[in-house]
């Protein structure tokens, strides 16, 4: 009896062992499936895949993009719409390699437009190098002779244009261009403006980019004259304002900002720059119209995505 009892107990232990092993295996398989998101209803509870999908969706769902590239105390803005790309200003001459690398990283190997607001080095510094390195379909720039702007940087740009036999337009206010899903209109300076070698800033070409739903305004180093002309003669309401003259107090007048009413105001400037940009008065005026101020010296490169309805960044 004792022997049978022991044998019977041994069989019972073996059966429980088998059951435990089977149950453990099932639990392990279910755990793996749950963690990898293969059990229906579980995948959306995993933080990492969900966050990754959201980021990708924002980028792949965008119809066009605006990249306010951090070029220190200078300016460079890249606009991408599918296979179309425009670069507005090109930073200083020492920024060429960085800008070319950035273009490559975001998949831009040619430009439909190279838009140059005015011939100061912090806006056209890398233009010659860019023209020599990648295909540029058309250059848009103010019609300023070398006699008015006698700088090595400007002479180098004109030489590169001649070497590459670039197509150059000298647009005036009111001219409109198409690019992908959007168009852009020249909004300053006045067609009657006569370039003054003492103040090339007021010769800055300004553009208003629009997809019909959202608008961006950019006008180089334009100051009071440019702003007054735009207020009087142009439609300038914009969701995003690339702030004039790096946030100088001589730009971004109250009357001008009241017309633009930007949701976002981007200031391209260098950290601890010698000019003290952005100036306190300009910041106060921007704040007074409810603009969210964004600065490249604090945030680095700033990218906006447009999906036809919304703006994300």
What is the predicted role of each segment?
Residues 2-313:
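Non-globular, low-confidence helical/coil segments that flank catalytic cores
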């Amino acid at each position: 009896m004792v022997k049978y009892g022991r044998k019977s107990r041994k069989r019972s232990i073996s059966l429980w062992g088998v059951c435990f092993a089977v149950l453990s295996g099932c639990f392990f398989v279910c755990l793996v499936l749950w963690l990898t998101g293969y059990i229906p209803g579980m995948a959306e509870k995993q933080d990492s895949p969900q966050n990754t999908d959201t980021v990708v969706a924002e980028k792949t769902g965008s119809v066009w993009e605006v990249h306010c590239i951090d070029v220190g105390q200078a300016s460079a803005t890249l606009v991408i719409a599918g296979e179309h790309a425009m670069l507005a200003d090109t930073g200083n001459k020492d920024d060429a390699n960085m800008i070319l690398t950035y273009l490559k990283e975001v998949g831009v190997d040619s430009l439909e437009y190279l838009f140059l607001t005015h011939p100061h080095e912090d806006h056209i510094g890398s233009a010659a190098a860019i023209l020599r390195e990648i295909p540029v379909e058309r250059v848009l720039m103010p019609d300023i002779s070398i006699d008015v702007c006698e700088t090595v940087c400007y002479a180098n740009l004109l030489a590169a244009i001649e070497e590459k036999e670039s197509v150059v337009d000298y647009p005036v206010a009111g001219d409109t261009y198409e690019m992908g899903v959007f168009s852009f209109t020249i909004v300053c300076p006045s067609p009657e403006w006569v370039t003054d070698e003492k103040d090339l800033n007021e010769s800055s070409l300004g553009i208003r980019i629009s997809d019909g739903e959202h608008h961006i305004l950019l006008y180089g180093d334009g100051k009071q004259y440019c702003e007054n002309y735009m207020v009087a003669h142009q439609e300038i309401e914009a969701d995003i304002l690339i702030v004039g003259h790096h946030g100088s107090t001589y730009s971004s007048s109250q009357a001008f900002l009241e017309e633009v009413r930007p949701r976002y105001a981007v200031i391209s400037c260098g950290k601890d720059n010698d000019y003290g940009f952005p100036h306190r008065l300009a910041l106060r005026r921007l704040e007074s119209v409810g603009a969210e101020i964004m600065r490249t010296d604090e945030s680095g490169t700033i990218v906006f995505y447009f999906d036809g309805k919304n703006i994300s960044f």
